[in-house]
Amino acid sequence: MGERNFLIEGISGSGKTSVATMLENRGFDVIHGDRLLAYQGDPQTGVPVMPRPQDPAFVNAHHIWDVDQLKRLIDDQTHPRTFFCGASRNRHHFAQWFDAIFLLETDWATISRRLDGRPGEWGDDPRERSLIQQLHISRIDLPIGAIAIDATRPLHEVVDAILARC
């Protein structure tokens, strides 16, 4: 999709979708990876697995992106810059395709407040919320070596900070 491609990652509630929407509103090419590319699969092989919606840890551990579809999008250089927003557990298969990876960093109070503001979505269920809090503390699913962006700031400042590094 872009001559240069950027991945914006973060834990649930860190602001990925809000950042993506603001980038779109500013005229940038954006792929909502969790909407377009995500499915439940084995993070090593990509083989689809039977979803287990009642098991948040399983859902999280098997939330992966379609690597072949992602590669097609990255190879299409129609736009000067494309931003891919979302999270996946098979990032290790494609992280090297991005010019930079940004990590939206925020505190638990901010994440919790944001999750409260999106009823019916991931993180609304108490078991999901508990898992998100554990992941926030452990940082186990976060990309190592990513460019940290303080996502507690106003949204336009977060987006400006990302664009300043592109």
Which residues are covered by each model-predicted region?
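Hydrophobic anchor at the beta1->P-loop junction of P-loop NTPases
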Residues: I8
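P-loop (Walker A) phosphate-binding loop of NTP-binding proteins
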Residues: I11
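ATP-binding Walker
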Residues: S14
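Walker A/P-loop
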Residues: T17
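Conserved substrate/cofactor phosphate-moiety recognition/catalytic segment
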Residues: T21-D68
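Loop/turn-to-beta-strand initiation segments
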Residues: T78-F83
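Small-molecule kinase domains that catalyze NTP-dependent phosphoryl transfer to phosphate-bearing small molecules
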Residues: R91, P119-I162
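Conserved phosphate-donor/acceptor-positioning beta-strand/loop module used by diverse small-molecule
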Residues: W97-G117
